[in-house]
């Protein structure tokens, strides 16, 4: 069976459902796929059971259950991620297994914002999810319009507390379950034929309009983490790796950043699969020939980048998830002063954890396996670091935590 070719006709956007347990995230995900399936060619409906029994996948050595679905609206192609368990969300967002360009926050109109609603909003803020659209679910269970308005106000206020624009965020009421039931009974329902199905359309209209199309990786500034270094007699030194973002072409001036003082060099050759290229773009695995660089000047863990786009740092604040014993993590707590390895892009760097904070800003004196915590890290060597960058924490070769850089200190 020939593989179906991925047709790139519409812009692609990654989104996900977030919110408190049992507020209807998975039901909504199923409803969206069913509604979009009968209205756009490139979508297939998914049943609740298929999404709920999400397969396990690994990201940075951590097992996460995640369901990936895809669908199209008239203007866009969406990849949508839904996690069955709360712990899966925490791990997913921190490891960046599912990088979201925006999220649909599902809040039950009957209950209002609950503790996990707030935790997911906070997480979204900390890991850099740029936009949120709200779906007020279970509208059919709320008899009093005013109650629903109060819940909407409370959600907007909660979003504002976490520095999202609470006044501007679109809030769409509806019932995911009734929309799903209507679609299951009659899978060919069109817009305008059922009030609950129409609310799913209204939600996707809001997502289409409010969540901006992300800048493609190829349009960003060039960056490649060095994986290996070779010396070619008579030609010079070649650094290999995968282009993380942007593009690079022959003759470009680039910088070598991290571990040693930053140096400038010129790209004198590009190779991929033994073929020479004029230009290389995000996603390519390439070898880059560098002018005037000796093999000992460059090593795994450094990055090649467009000049003055990334700088080396040693101290940063991060949001970290610490693995449980069952996940292969530590069996015992650790304390300030703990010195594990930090695996960033392609290399391990030893670092010291200076201090921990809980979400409420209070000082934490120790961290238990399974905790999510803010920590200040100081590395023994400077490496190229930027806000939003992911890393793993390792000890003796095994992953004990995963984190994302929230602020650079030094």
Curated annotation (Swiss-Prot):
<feature type="binding site">
    <location>
        <begin position="82"/>
        <end position="86"/>
    </location>
    <ligand>
        <name>GTP</name>
    </ligand>
</feature>
<dbReference type="InterPro" id="IPR027417">
    <property type="entry name" value="P-loop_NTPase"/>
</dbReference>
<feature type="binding site">
    <location>
        <begin position="137"/>
        <end position="140"/>
    </location>
    <ligand>
        <name>GTP</name>
    </ligand>
</feature>
<dbReference type="GO" id="GO:0005739">
    <property type="term" value="C:mitochondrion"/>
</dbReference>
<feature type="region of interest" description="G1">
    <location>
        <begin position="19"/>
        <end position="26"/>
    </location>
</feature>
<dbReference type="InterPro" id="IPR041709">
    <property type="entry name" value="EF-Tu_GTP-bd"/>
</dbReference>
<keyword id="KW-0934">Plastid</keyword>
<dbReference type="GO" id="GO:0003924">
    <property type="term" value="F:GTPase activity"/>
</dbReference>
<dbReference type="InterPro" id="IPR009000">
    <property type="entry name" value="Transl_B-barrel_sf"/>
</dbReference>
<keyword id="KW-0547">Nucleotide-binding</keyword>
<feature type="binding site">
    <location>
        <begin position="19"/>
        <end position="26"/>
    </location>
    <ligand>
        <name>GTP</name>
    </ligand>
</feature>
<feature type="region of interest" description="G4">
    <location>
        <begin position="137"/>
        <end position="140"/>
    </location>
</feature>
<protein>
    <recommendedName>
        <fullName>Elongation factor Tu, chloroplastic</fullName>
        <ecNumber>3.6.5.3</ecNumber>
    </recommendedName>
</protein>
<dbReference type="InterPro" id="IPR005225">
    <property type="entry name" value="Small_GTP-bd"/>
</dbReference>
<keyword id="KW-0479">Metal-binding</keyword>
<comment type="similarity">
    <text>Belongs to the TRAFAC class translation factor GTPase superfamily. Classic translation factor GTPase family. EF-Tu/EF-1A subfamily.</text>
</comment>
<keyword id="KW-0648">Protein biosynthesis</keyword>
<dbReference type="GO" id="GO:0009507">
    <property type="term" value="C:chloroplast"/>
</dbReference>
<feature type="domain" description="tr-type G">
    <location>
        <begin position="10"/>
        <end position="215"/>
    </location>
</feature>
<dbReference type="Pfam" id="PF03144">
    <property type="entry name" value="GTP_EFTU_D2"/>
</dbReference>
<dbReference type="Pfam" id="PF00009">
    <property type="entry name" value="GTP_EFTU"/>
</dbReference>
<dbReference type="InterPro" id="IPR004161">
    <property type="entry name" value="EFTu-like_2"/>
</dbReference>
<feature type="region of interest" description="G5">
    <location>
        <begin position="175"/>
        <end position="177"/>
    </location>
</feature>
<dbReference type="InterPro" id="IPR031157">
    <property type="entry name" value="G_TR_CS"/>
</dbReference>
<keyword id="KW-0150">Chloroplast</keyword>
<keyword id="KW-0342">GTP-binding</keyword>
<dbReference type="GO" id="GO:0005525">
    <property type="term" value="F:GTP binding"/>
</dbReference>
<comment type="function">
    <text>GTP hydrolase that promotes the GTP-dependent binding of aminoacyl-tRNA to the A-site of ribosomes during protein biosynthesis.</text>
</comment>
<keyword id="KW-0460">Magnesium</keyword>
<dbReference type="InterPro" id="IPR033720">
    <property type="entry name" value="EFTU_2"/>
</dbReference>
<dbReference type="InterPro" id="IPR004160">
    <property type="entry name" value="Transl_elong_EFTu/EF1A_C"/>
</dbReference>
<dbReference type="GO" id="GO:0003746">
    <property type="term" value="F:translation elongation factor activity"/>
</dbReference>
<dbReference type="InterPro" id="IPR050055">
    <property type="entry name" value="EF-Tu_GTPase"/>
</dbReference>
<feature type="region of interest" description="G2">
    <location>
        <begin position="61"/>
        <end position="65"/>
    </location>
</feature>
<keyword id="KW-0378">Hydrolase</keyword>
<dbReference type="GO" id="GO:0070125">
    <property type="term" value="P:mitochondrial translational elongation"/>
</dbReference>
<feature type="binding site">
    <location>
        <position position="26"/>
    </location>
    <ligand>
        <name>Mg(2+)</name>
    </ligand>
</feature>
<dbReference type="InterPro" id="IPR004541">
    <property type="entry name" value="Transl_elong_EFTu/EF1A_bac/org"/>
</dbReference>
<dbReference type="Pfam" id="PF03143">
    <property type="entry name" value="GTP_EFTU_D3"/>
</dbReference>
<feature type="region of interest" description="G3">
    <location>
        <begin position="82"/>
        <end position="85"/>
    </location>
</feature>
<dbReference type="InterPro" id="IPR000795">
    <property type="entry name" value="T_Tr_GTP-bd_dom"/>
</dbReference>
<dbReference type="InterPro" id="IPR009001">
    <property type="entry name" value="Transl_elong_EF1A/Init_IF2_C"/>
</dbReference>
